[in-house]
């Protein structure tokens, strides 16, 4: 081995490092002589970071210029060199393993011309960032010259950080990603970057205090004193502590509406701000660790100085709403008064029955949306954030089978509930038995969405943008002509409706309507009544595994029989997505036994030849209905004018 305890006097902390790697780093750092802190305390000298979007990183970048931000490879590489007995330089590989300034930053540019554009691109790549020519959802920062253009508009819509170019230069100067709030485009030039980070002068009192703390730390480590004594003498107050208790804000609404509110989609899109604390919650606390909750000073309450009036909520939900709003700084008023800022109603409350309030009216989904995005939205920014339910729309949505694509997070959850109370059925999977594929046109189409659109078009499922639904909700009138919002470009195709899960109602032609009316008024065929059971009654008693929707009436004593089949057509889709397509054929008056026969079951070849022999041997009458039944499989004989039975 090399020098004994090369990291003695170093105090190391981690952020956004997974549990396995964090354990490795803490173990090896301790063997190298460093002190490892789970919490970000004042004596920390090196922060090992896996992402820039964490509280520890942000605090170090802004308020601790003395701290060196390192990559996760530093300790393992240094440890291997140490155990191999290599001579370690005075820098202890620190300079080689600094975390790149723009680590995990994906930068896009807009409204910046040449040659400045090429210069910025080169600096982004040089300092470890990724340059993105096109704006996508995974871009972290948009550097804009002016507050205009499509990229700028979509960046605001997608909650992407929009900054001026000074953000890049100051981040490079600080060797860390600075917070975008100090580099807004609408700031005066003299205020841009003001307060973004502490510029540490070695001669200042603050710099000396940091130096003294580090000396104290080294002296205490050398003297072998306990961490408890060190904390007492060096005043080790935790700056940012790990999270040891449940996070109330993220589950405030899980019981609202008798269902859990899903936040998992958003955690997939954007890394959770405090994800680096999560693994440590399962670790037992050591005796020398301070068991303190995360406490960030001066965190503003979301609903601070806002007063709410709750209208027509059940008592169980009133208590939850009261706790949710009060925990986030809101006030609840028991009576309507001039101090009210918002009236909150249930999302299912009919608009027509709502009194006229002189205050902005929202539903509880507006509160969920604000909590989800951690910002206050205007009541007109989303159609489902204010009263929208109209019972008059329910008959129009009844029978609609809808599948959603391109939606995530709280918007997906709210959209499902809204369509359900409007009378539609929302399915998790796309199949042929769907009326509409509702697409989120506010987002770029993913490959999965494109795949669904392609198959929906092939299956005659209307592909419609979500703006169609927003227009219905805002106007209060159902719009059956979806062409202005159609993505499938099928102008005249009507929307399919379903009476139940397995039967589809198709638009019928005038000819089919007249024929069905005539069938309802007179007996089928030219037979006389008899006591023999009809094939239809026998069919009803068959096993459930026989999937036949064929209407057959035969008279065993009649020379003429009329058969009206419904042929089953199976199209790839969900497990239950079998389309029963009604096909009614008006028979011609036969002068001889009908010879055009086929079978619903393709495996009934043996029975086919048997029946063919009966037909050819007796030309005076069709065999009785009972003889047309396979005793083993219960197969049904049907007739069709457009098929011919051929001897095999």
Swiss-Prot record:
User: Which segments constitute the BRCT domain?
Assistant: 2-92, 96-185, 298-384, 392-486
Q: Which domain of life is it from?
A: Eukaryota
Carrying Phosphoserine, the residues are 592
Record's Gene3D superfamilies? BRCT domain
Position of motif Nuclear localization signal? Answer: 242-249, 643-648
| One Gene Ontology term from the biological process aspect of the record | mitotic DNA replication checkpoint signaling
**Cellular compartments per GO CC:** chromatin; cytosol; DNA replication preinitiation complex; mitotic spindle; mitotic spindle pole body; nucleus; site of double-strand break
Name the predominant localization: nucleus
A GO term for molecular function? signaling adaptor activity
Pfam families in the record:
BRCT (PF00533), PTCB-BRCT (PF12738)
**According to its UniProt record, where is this protein located?**
Nucleus
What are the UniProt keywords, alphabetically?
DNA replication, Nucleus, Phosphoprotein, Repeat
Describe its partners and assembly state: Interacts with drc1/sld2. Interacts (via BRCT1,2 domains) with crb2; a single rad4 molecule interacts simultaneously with both 'Thr-187' phosphorylation sites in a crb2 dimer.
Q: What does this protein do?
A: Essential component for DNA replication and also the checkpoint control system which couples S and M phases. May directly or indirectly interact with chromatin proteins to form the complex required for the initiation and/or progression of DNA synthesis. Interacts simultaneously with both 'Thr-187' phosphorylation sites in a crb2 dimer for establishing the DNA checkpoint.
What protein name applies here?
S-M checkpoint control protein rad4
């Amino acid at each position: 081995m090399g020098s004994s305890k090369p990291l003695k006097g170093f105090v190391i902390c981690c952020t956004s490092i997974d549990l396995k790697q964090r354990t490795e780093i803490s173990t090896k750092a301790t063997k190298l002589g460093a002190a490892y802190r789970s919490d970000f305390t004042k004596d920390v000298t090196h922060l090992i970071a896996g992402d820039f979007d964490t509280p520890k990183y942000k605090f170090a970048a802004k308020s601790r210029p003395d701290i060196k931000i390192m990559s996760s490879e530093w300790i393992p590489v240094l440890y291997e060199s140490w155990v191999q007995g290599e001579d370690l330089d005075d820098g202890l590989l620190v300079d080689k393993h600094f975390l790149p300034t723009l680590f995990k930053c994906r930068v896009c540019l807009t409204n910046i011309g040449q040659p400045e554009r090429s210069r910025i691109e080169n600096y982004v790549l040089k300092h470890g960032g990724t340059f993105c020519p096109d704006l996508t959802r995974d871009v972290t920062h948009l550097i804009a010259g002016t507050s205009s253009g499509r990229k700028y508009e979509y960046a605001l819509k997608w909650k992407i950080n929009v900054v001026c170019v000074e953000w890049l230069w100051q981040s490079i100067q600080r060797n860390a990603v600075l917070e975008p709030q100090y580099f807004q485009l609408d700031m005066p030039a003299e205020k841009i970057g003001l307060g973004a980070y502490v510029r540490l002068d070695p001669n200042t009192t603050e710099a000396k205090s940091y130096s003294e703390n580090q000396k104290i730390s080294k002296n205490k480590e050398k003297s072998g004193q306990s961490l408890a004594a060190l904390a007492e003498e060096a005043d080790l107050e935790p700056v940012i502590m790990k999270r040891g208790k449940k996070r109330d804000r993220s589950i405030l609404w899980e019981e609202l509406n008798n269902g859990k509110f899903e936040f998992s989609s958003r955690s997939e899109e954007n890394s959770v701000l405090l994800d680096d604390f999560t693994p440590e919650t399962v670790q037992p606390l050591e005796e020398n660790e301070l068991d303190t909750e995360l406490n960030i000073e001066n965190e503003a309450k979301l609903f601070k100085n806002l007063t709410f009036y709750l209208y027509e909520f059940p008592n169980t939900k009133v208590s939850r709403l009261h706790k949710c709003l009060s925990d986030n700084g809101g006030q609840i008023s028991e009576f309507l008064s001039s101090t009210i800022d918002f009236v909150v109603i249930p999302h299912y409350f009919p608009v027509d029955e709502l009194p006229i309030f002189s205050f902005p009216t929202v539903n509880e989904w507006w509160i969920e949306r604000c909590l989800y995005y951690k910002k206050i939205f205007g009541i007109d920014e989303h159609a489902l954030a204010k009263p929208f339910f109209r019972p008059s729309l329910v008959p129009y949505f009844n029978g609609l089978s809808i599948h959603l694509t391109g939606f995530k997070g709280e918007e997906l959850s709210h959209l499902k509930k809204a369509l359900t109370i409007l009378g539609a059925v929302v399915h998790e999977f796309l199949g042929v038995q769907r009326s509409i594929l509702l697409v989120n046109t506010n987002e770029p189409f993913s490959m999965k969405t494109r795949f669904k659109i392609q198959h929906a078009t092939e299956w005659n499922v209307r592909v419609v943008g979500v703006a169609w639904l927003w227009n219905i909700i805002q106007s209060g009138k159902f719009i059956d002509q979806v062409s202005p919002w159609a993505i499938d470009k099928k102008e005249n195709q009507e929307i399919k409706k379903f009476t139940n899960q397995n039967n589809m109602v198709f638009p019928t032609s005038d000819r089919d309507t007249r024929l069905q009316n005539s069938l309802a008024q007179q007996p089928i065929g030219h037979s006389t009544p008899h006591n023999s059971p009809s094939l239809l009654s026998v069919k009803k008693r068959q096993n459930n595994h026989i999937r036949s929707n064929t209407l057959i009436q035969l008279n065993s004593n009649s020379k003429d029989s009329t058969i009206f089949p419904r042929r089953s057509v199976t199209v790839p889709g969900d497990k239950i997505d079998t389309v029963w397509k009604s096909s009614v054929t008006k028979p011609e008056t036969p002068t001889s036994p009908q010879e055009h026969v086929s079978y619903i079951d393709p495996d009934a070849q043996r029975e086919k030849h048997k029946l063919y022999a009966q037909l050819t041997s007796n030309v005076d009458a069709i065999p009785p209905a009972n003889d047309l039944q396979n005793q083993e499989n219960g197969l049904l004989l049907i007739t069709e004018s457009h098929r011919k039975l051929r001897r095999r």
